Amino acid sequence: MNKIIIDGYYKEKECLGKISGIIFKNWEDNEPIDRISIIINNFDSYIPGEFYKRELPGIVKLLENIDLDKFDTIILDSHVWLWNDEESFEKSKPGLGAHLYKKLGRKNLNIIGIAKSYYRDNNLHTFQCFRGNSKNPLYVDSINQDKDYSEVIKSMYGNFRIPYLIKLADTESKINFK
């Protein structure tokens, strides 16, 4: 099964965004199978804690260009959860990844969030991933709150804090767009 890393870049003044996806098969791959990108307009402004309102429509539009039945994982440059409730999964506050999971309605599709910064009150099911010589972790969470994906992220190709294919998704969203 394939995996896709999705990232976006936005030009506020022009109200344009570019959403890019890097498609790969195995966690250790050093090159993508494919790259896809779309240009979007009329996106919402960034609001802390409601990042999904800006990102979700473009991500869904990008995913319309692939056969999701051939994918088992979507990786986002974002948190899946913003707040975790110890007693109830249903009481947890959804982040971009959880909103995407709900929108897609595919129980067999895993959503992993990889964030460069910690989000307050999101420590119960967020795992730290130290890569390379970095003293700063990546923060990894998933739709399956109890599953620790930090080891698979650590196994991804690249010597630095951010795995090569994740960095490539960021770069791809800016190529011919900045």
For each predicted feature, which ranges?
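C-terminal binding/interaction regions
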Residues: 1-6, 34-50, 56-69, 73, ...
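N-terminal beta1-alpha1 ligand-phosphate binding loop
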Residues: 4-17
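Short acidic (Asp/Glu) patches
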Residues: 54-61, 91-97
